[in-house]
UniProtKB/Swiss-Prot annotation:
One annotated GO molecular function: growth hormone-releasing hormone activity
Organism: Papio hamadryas (Hamadryas baboon)
Entry superkingdom: Eukaryota
Lipid-modified sites (O-decanoyl serine): 26
Protein name: Appetite-regulating hormone
Lipid-modified residues, O-hexanoyl serine kind: 26
Amino acid sequence: MPSPGTVCSLLLLGMLWLDLAMAGSSFLSPEHQRAQQRKESKKPPAKLQPRALGGWLRPEDGDQAEGAEDELEIQFNAPFDVGIKLSGVQYQQHSQALGKFLQDILWEEAKEAPADK
């Protein structure tokens, strides 16, 4: 007959093995996968814009239908986010002032950056 220490050890190992098996089966069960998919589907898709593009002027929608009014959207990330929407006529009227404004902001940032380090 096995000693009481051996029986207790076997029971302890059996309980640990059972816990491990239950944890693995719940992780791999289809119900767990469905729950994960539901969690992921609730998250709205993130619209990420890399900061490396900061300072570049870029139209958002270049493939507009012919005959549609030209619209330009300018976005950049300096120390803050800026977004501007202009029609083609407005852009023609204000392009020089807008260019000077952007240049002043970017030059100020470039001058301040080495001083921060």
